[in-house]
């Protein structure tokens, strides 16, 4: 991470149907094979083709793990039971991030803008720290809130 990147926000690529499942609340955890830094509070989701844009921002809780003695996830969301039971399709997905809120960006950030305006060389393929220029120009909390926990 450079000083031109946010220490609290990351970009993660997301394919369909998973993005729709997050937006409509059926998927209430994001599962990853790696632990994000504890300072990360929000994920800006880059929707892959055909959307090719950052369209949603989610506030997240710190990582939950599935080590012996850990409290299992509530099994109300897609993938939660599989995470808890270590289903074979969930091998190595050892970190679960509870989605606390979902915001839709009123004017999605298109790939051409990410490249031209914000200096990203290509579409995000893995996790990327959010450029500070995006964080400073897009007020995440002023976007349209779709849902929030509690």
Spans of features found by a protein language model:
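Structured alpha/beta reader/binder surfaces that contact nucleic acids or chromatin modification marks
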Residues: 2-150
